[in-house]
Amino acid sequence: MLLRQYINVPRLGEIMNLKELTVILIIPIVYLGVCGCFEIVPKSFYDNFSSYNVGDKAPFGEWKVKEGGFKIEAILSEDKKTLNKVAVPINNGIIYIDKNYTDFKFIVDIKRLEESDSPKIYFRLINNANAGYYIDIEGFDRGYVLYKFNGTKVEKLAESYDAAPAGTDFYRYEVVAKDNKIIFLAGGQKYIEYTDNNTPILKGGIGIGGGRAYYDNVRVEPIE
């Protein structure tokens, strides 16, 4: 009697209430997962292609192929002292990371093979990269153009007739996407700022390719 007096032994009704509470807590979580209402924000992403072998062809790592092909090559660093692995399109190929980034900074280093080349930067890609936005880095440093596309439909949204003097050197390009505003920078200088008020795409993956160039140091950083 004394032992039972000091030990809190749960009654049957209390056990049932605990089970009911567990069910009540689990059902909404399962529902959120099934309906897609609950979504985990993707973490930051970085790839300098050093973990792959020279000659590897996409898909590799987290990269998927949208069209054409991509391969890993080794080229001399800018100081010509070491070999550096980079990603190169095959037949103007495009590869992409299939994640739902909403607000983010997307940074990539690009080096044209020839001054006439026009590589591209893709972002907020959806539907297996069949829709989204891209920046066209025009050849001969003529400028930059922001496009929105859906399948074969392509719409020019904004452009800059000024451009950084990249030539055939590695240059750092950056896209900042927050809500429906898009900012494009080259070498830290802003060249395009555009607000898409016509059914904007507010989340999606990122991609590279669409023109002859070396790509390196691809980075995506979510922003608040």
UniProtKB/Swiss-Prot annotation:
Signal peptide: none annotated. It is found in: Membrane. InterPro entries: 3-keto-disaccharide_hydrolase. Keywords: Membrane, Transmembrane, Transmembrane helix. Its main location: membrane. GO terms for molecular function: hydrolase activity. The chain crosses the membrane at residues 21-41. It comes from the Archaea. One of its GO terms (cellular component) is membrane. Pfam families: 3keto-disac_hyd. It is a single-pass membrane protein. This is Uncharacterized protein MJ0945. It comes from Methanocaldococcus jannaschii (strain ATCC 43067 / DSM 2661 / JAL-1 / JCM 10045 / NBRC 100440).
